[in-house]
């Protein structure tokens, strides 16, 4: 066949008899694990079968004399399994399984199998054997069909639904079809063994051992049927109607919905209408008959629809009554037992609800598949409540509606026709064999059936197998007469009624099972509570036992602990002793190491202390050395200051004494001078006439002398040594004034012009020799008065009527020590003319304008044009004026920015006012642009006796040149050579000294060379010279007049010669000219000029010997810082080992607008001779809020030696005075 061709199989051999010692059960579990099935391998006798919703066994009644058939035993076992629910405790389940296996083994020994190996049927199945003997030959095909269906269902349940029921059912079906004929042939000789009959009540005489006596858990099939009947009769009318009512409308509605998309032609519509009408008629007829039977359940005859109950061998595994009873042993269903894991009743309840949740579609599930067989109800035709063996509805089986939709109901009608014919034949045979339909019990109807799921039964294969069977059946029934149309319709109604009846049975069975499930659930809850209580009791008992056991163990442990503690104590004592010994040894080693460490530390500490002591001693020595040095330095400074103060005090005392002496002397001299002047005026009046004549002669001689001097201008000077003459007593009265000879320096030879000497009173010789001596010394004036009898009148008479007589004489050479003429002295004095016999009257009338023999302007008209100079002189004859000279106001004028000297005082060395002098003649030494210095003796005498020096000896190089007194002084006795008071260290001449005559008297006493001055004293004159070079080094008195070249005969003329130092000579091209170019008409010098880098002396008010270069601001600041640090360090202001706080330094540098950072930056500058030298040490402040500390370290003397001051004239190593032009003899 089609279905078997796809799954060929080999028929298995017959099973051997069960051994009593073999394992009696096999265990199966469903998919979800909620249930497991234990199936005994051997058959055991049972009282009866009960309906079960989960297990269905095939009733394969083999012929034999056994007291219980396989089907009967199976039904009993299943009923017992259904009623029994395993508790939660697994131990009880195992005990029950063992008891069931033991009972099965015992039953197998008591009822041994026949020699052919097939079990003998029970006596209650004798009717089945009898029916098998009367089966007709035309039923063989149906028997084969049913056997195949039975084998399929049996094989499904033997293997369990949870273990792949689909595959097992297919294989079993194929095995049945192939091996059925041979098996039947082999079993036919044993068929007479089934003829024995045993009444049904004997089934209850063999209760199953090990089963609980509670009937709710353990009931037989018969008892369950009785219970179902009692349940039905106990229901009310409404409950019965509710159970038996079939939802006709739901079925029709479902059919309409399924046919909605089918063909809508008229033919199909008529078919659908006919089917619907037929179904309605069938349902209505079924309701009427069911109601009649329900109202009369105990009638003798069963209703027409229940005359014969259909047998669903294809699904239940039960063999029809008319079939042979010889089946192979492997079709024999095993005794099965269901064990639920907690809620069997709930699963059954849910299963039943699911079965009826599809709007009564399940009613048709049995109309297509199940009517192929029928179950003979001859043994209980009137027992309606002996319901079909476990009608569990499952999905997936073809329903009536599906059949009607697929093949228009043709298959359904044909199936019902065939079944009707076979049923009728079997019923007739059964009536013929058994007289009464109630003579047999339903012991063989106890098998339960569980329809397979959708995936376990292949509907297509089922239909194919069914079609093949039908073909074979139709082939074997060709000779049978066909039924009429009315019979087919009647048979269809009966088959539908059978289907509806079975559905009714299913509903009643479901309701009953729901009730039983509830009862079992309650009982289970009670058992669970009991089990829980017993468990709690057992738990308490166990706890008590455990407690006792713990106590025993505790006592035992205590003993062991005591023993162990004792051993531990002994062991610890030993270890303690051992450890004490080790500790003692370790302590000894530690003490030794500690002693060594202490010794090392002591040694190290001693070394450290020694090092610290040495370091402290070294620091102390350094500190002491520094302190000693500082103290020595301070002591030296203090001694130096003390010496200076003592020297100053001595000088002040001496000066005070000298001033007092000079004042006394001046008073005396003033009185004497007044008397002398009176006598001189008288003498001058007498000699006025001779003086005029003498002057005329002298003028002629001077002209000749000037020509001769011009011729001798180029001759080299010859050093002349003049002997000194002792001073003579001063004559107090002179009969007549004799013109004084012109004063000449000792280094020049003066031409002597012989002139006629008038008859004048003879001048004493000492006075003449003294005049020669005065040319070699610095003159001083003791007062304005002159002594009578003096040969030289040095000041004009205060009386205006006194004439001044001049005599011709040689031209006066330039004077090295001129007189600074102040404004008060020169007021009212006119320049006299050198003409002979000229009388100057200062009070009555001005002098007459006379021609200047040297081409200069006249004396009373100094600004007239001058004639050409004599031969041999420079051609620069025009007046050469300095840049700041104003010829209109020449007297007592100073350059812009220069300070003029007060009246009666000589201008200081560096800032003398410019005085008018004759062009071509240099000024005096102390006034570089002075007037009247260098005039001829006659003109000099006209200026007054105060302007003529009485002592003209030049100092030997001192920078301090005192002003010349305006009055003639008597020559006193020479004193030993000593240090002049004017050059005392650190002293300057004050203006008051020049007025009261103290300096004059001092210079009279202190004559001689300045070479005896101390070198260190001379170095203090100009402190700046220690760091700056001087621009000029020529000594005063021997230098040329500034701006004017030297004239012939060693004279300093105002006429510029080539290569002479003149401020109006051309400026050298390489020199920087910081000033404006010279004005037009002023010649330039090839050397130094006023617009060169070195300003001319007198122009800027500075002596060329001490003019300094302009220094940068940083150099000035550093020099000031050096001076401040030296002053503070010398004064003991530093209290930090020579370091001075920056705050104190800033307090002494207020004249500079600098901050601390600039001062600190200046401290980092390297010292050199130009910025102060030395170096600075800066230390961090001692406290965060303090200021840095600065210490100035000056350079040593060796480093300063090359930059020392230039020696003064007369010092050892000083430059040669006059650049070797002359030598002054002593």
UniProtKB/Swiss-Prot annotation:
Record's signal peptide: none
Principal localisation: cytoplasm
Bias (Acidic residues): 343-372, 454-484
Residue stretches of biased makeup (Polar residues): 45-59, 113-130, 326-335, 791-805, 822-852
Segments of skewed composition (Basic residues): 89-99, 170-180
Alphabetical keyword list: Coiled coil, Cytoplasm, Stress response
Cellular compartment(s): Cytoplasm
Statement: the UniProt record of this protein carries the keyword Transmembrane helix: no
Region of interest called Disordered, as start-end residue ranges on this chain: 1-225, 294-388, 423-491, 526-727, 757-876, 944-1001
Residue stretches in coiled coil: 517-708
Ranges annotated as biased composition (Basic and acidic residues): 131-152, 211-225, 423-432, 442-453, 530-548, 556-706
GO CC, any one term: cytoplasm
Compositionally biased intervals (Low complexity): 707-716, 777-790
Described function: May act as a negative regulator of salt tolerance.
Family, similarity comment: Belongs to the NST1 family.
PANTHER family for the chain: LD36051P, STRESS RESPONSE PROTEIN NST1-RELATED
Protein known as: Stress response protein nst1
Organism: Neurospora crassa (strain ATCC 24698 / 74-OR23-1A / CBS 708.71 / DSM 1257 / FGSC 987)
């Amino acid at each position: 066949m089609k279905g078997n061709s796809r799954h060929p199989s080999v028929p298995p051999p017959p099973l051997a008899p069960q051994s009593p010692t073999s394992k009696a059960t096999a265990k199966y579990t469903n998919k979800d694990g909620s249930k497991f099935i234990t199936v005994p391998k051997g058959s055991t006798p049972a009282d009866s079968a009960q309906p079960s919703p989960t297990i269905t066994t095939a009733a394969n009644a083999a012929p034999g004399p056994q007291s219980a058939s396989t089907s009967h035993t199976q039904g009993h076992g299943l009923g017992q399994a259904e009623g029994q629910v395993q508790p939660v405790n697994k131990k009880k389940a195992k005990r029950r399984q063992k008891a069931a296996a033991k009972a099965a083994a015992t039953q197998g020994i008591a009822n041994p199998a026949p020699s052919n190996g097939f079990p003998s049927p029970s006596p209650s199945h004798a009717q089945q054997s009898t029916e098998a003997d009367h089966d007709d030959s035309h039923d063989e095909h149906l028997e084969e069909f049913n056997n195949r269906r039975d084998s399929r269902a049996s094989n499904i349940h033997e293997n369990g639904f949870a273990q792949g029921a689909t595959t097992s059912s297919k294989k079993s079906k194929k095995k049945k079809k192939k091996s059925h004929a041979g098996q039947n042939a082999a079993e036919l000789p044993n068929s007479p063994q089934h003829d024995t009959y045993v009444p049904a009540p004997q089934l209850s005489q063999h209760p199953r051992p090990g089963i609980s006596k509670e009937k709710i858990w353990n009931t037989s099939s018969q008892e369950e049927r009785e219970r179902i009947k009692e349940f039905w009769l106990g229901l009310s009318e409404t409950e019965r109607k509710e159970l038996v009512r079939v939802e006709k409308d739901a079925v029709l509605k479902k059919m309409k919905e399924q046919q909605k998309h089918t063909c809508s032609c008229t033919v199909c519509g008529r078919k659908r209408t006919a089917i619907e009408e037929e179904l309605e008629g069938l349902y209505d007829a079924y309701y009427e008959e069911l109601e009649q039977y329900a109202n009369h359940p105990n009638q003798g005859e069963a209703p027409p629809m229940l005359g014969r109950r259909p047998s669903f061998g294809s699904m239940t595994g039960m063999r029809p009554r008319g079939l042979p009873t010889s089946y192979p042993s492997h079709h024999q269903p095993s005794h099965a037992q269901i064990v639920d894991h907690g809620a069997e009743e709930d699963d059954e309840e849910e299963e039943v609800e699911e079965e009826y949740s599809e709007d009564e579609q399940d009613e048709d599930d049995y109309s297509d598949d199940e009517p192929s067989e029928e179950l003979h109800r001859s043994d209980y035709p009137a027992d309606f409540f002996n319901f079909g063996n476990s009608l569990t509805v499952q999905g997936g089986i073809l329903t009536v509606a599906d059949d009607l939709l697929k093949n228009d109901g043709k298959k359904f009608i044909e199936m019902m026709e065939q079944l009707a014919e076979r049923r009728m034949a079997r019923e007739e045979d059964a009536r013929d064999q058994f007289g009464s339909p109630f003579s047999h019990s339903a012991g063989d109807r106890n098998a339960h059936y569980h329809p397979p799921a959708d995936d376990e039964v292949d509907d297509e294969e089922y239909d194919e197998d069914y079609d093949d069977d039908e073909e074979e059946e139709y082939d074997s029934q060709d000779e049978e007469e066909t039924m009429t149309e009315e019979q087919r319709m009647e048979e269809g109604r009966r088959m539908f009624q059978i289907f509806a009846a079975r559905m009714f049975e299913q509903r009643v069975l479901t309701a009953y099972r729901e009730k039983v499930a509830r009862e079992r659930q309650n009982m289970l809850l009670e058992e669970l509570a009991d089990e829980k209580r017993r468990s709690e009791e057992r738990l308490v008992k166990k706890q008590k036992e455990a407690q006792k056991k713990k106590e025993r163990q505790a006592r035992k442990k205590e003993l062991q602990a005591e023993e162990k503690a004792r051993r531990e104590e002994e062991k610890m004592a030993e270890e303690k002793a051992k450890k004490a010994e080790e500790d003692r040894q370790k302590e000894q080693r530690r003490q030794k190491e500690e002693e060594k460490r202490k010794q090392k530390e002591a040694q190290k500490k001693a070394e450290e202390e020694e090092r610290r002591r040495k370091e402290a001693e070294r620091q102390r020595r350094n500190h002491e050395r520094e302190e000693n040095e500082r103290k020595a330095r301070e002591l030296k400074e203090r001694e130096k200051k003390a010496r200076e103060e003592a020297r100053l005090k001595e000088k002040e005392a001496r000066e005070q004494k000298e001033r007092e002496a000079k004042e006394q002397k001046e008073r005396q001299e003033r009185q004497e001078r007044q008397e002398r002047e009176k006598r001189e005026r008288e003498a001058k009046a007498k000699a006025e006439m001779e003086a005029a004549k003498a002057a005329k002669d002298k003028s002629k001689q001077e002209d000749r002398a000037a020509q001769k001097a011009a011729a001798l201008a180029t001759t080299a000077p010859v050093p002349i040594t003049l002997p000194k003459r002792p001073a003579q007593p001063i004559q107090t009265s002179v009969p007549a004034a004799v013109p004084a000879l012109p004063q000449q320096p000792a280094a020049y030879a003066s031409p002597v012009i012989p002139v006629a000497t008038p008859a004048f009173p003879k001048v004493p010789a000492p006075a003449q020799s003294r005049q020669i001596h005065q040319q070699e010394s610095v003159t001083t004036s003791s007062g304005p008065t002159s002594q009578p009898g003096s040969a030289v009148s040095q000041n004009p008479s205060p009386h205006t009527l006194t004439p001044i007589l001049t005599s011709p004489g040689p031209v006066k050479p330039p004077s090295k020590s001129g007189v600074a003429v102040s404004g008060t002295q020169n007021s009212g004095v006119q320049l006299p003319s050198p003409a002979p016999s000229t009388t100057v009257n200062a009070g009555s009338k001005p002098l007459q304008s006379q021609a200047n023999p040297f081409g200069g302007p006249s004396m009373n008209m100094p600004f007239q044009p001058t004639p050409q100079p004599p031969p041999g002189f420079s051609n620069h004859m025009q007046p050469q004026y300095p840049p700041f000279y104003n010829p209109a106001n020449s007297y007592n004028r100073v350059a812009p920015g220069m300070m003029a000297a007060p009246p009666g005082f000589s201008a200081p060395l560096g800032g003398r006012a410019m005085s008018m002098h004759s062009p071509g003649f240099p000024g005096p030494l102390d006034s570089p642009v002075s007037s009247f210095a260098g005039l001829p003796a006659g003109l000099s005498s006209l200026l007054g006796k105060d302007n003529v020096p009485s002592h003209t000896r030049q100092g030997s190089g001192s920078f301090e040149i005192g002003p010349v007194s305006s009055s003639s002084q008597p020559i006193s006795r020479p004193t030993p050579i000593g240090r002049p008071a004017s050059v005392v260290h650190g002293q300057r001449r004050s203006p008051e000294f020049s007025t009261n005559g103290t300096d004059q008297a001092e210079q009279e006493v202190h004559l001689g060379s300045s070479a005896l001055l101390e070198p260190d004293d001379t170095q203090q004159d100009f402190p700046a010279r220690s760091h700056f070079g001087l621009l000029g080094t020529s000594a005063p008195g021997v230098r040329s007049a500034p701006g004017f070249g030297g004239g012939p005969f060693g004279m300093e003329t105002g006429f510029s010669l080539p290569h002479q130092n003149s401020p109006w000579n051309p400026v050298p091209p390489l020199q920087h000219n910081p000033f404006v170019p010279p004005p037009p008409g002023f010649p330039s010098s090839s050397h130094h000029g006023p617009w060169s880098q070195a300003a001319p002396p007198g122009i800027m008010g500075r002596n060329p010997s001490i003019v300094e270069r302009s220094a940068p601001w940083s150099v000035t600041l550093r020099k000031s810082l050096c001076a401040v640090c030296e002053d503070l360090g010398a004064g003991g202001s530093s209290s930090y080992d020579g370091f001075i706080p920056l705050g104190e330094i800033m307090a002494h540098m207020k004249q500079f607008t600098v901050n601390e950072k600039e001062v600190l930056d200046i401290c980092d500058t390297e010292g050199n001779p130009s910025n102060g030298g030395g170096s600075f040490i800066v230390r961090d402040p001692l406290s965060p809020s303090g200021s840095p500390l600065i210490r100035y370290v000056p350079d040593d003397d060796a480093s300063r030696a090359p930059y020392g001051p230039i020696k003064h004239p007369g010092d050892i190593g000083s430059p040669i005075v006059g650049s070797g032009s002359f030598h002054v003899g002593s």
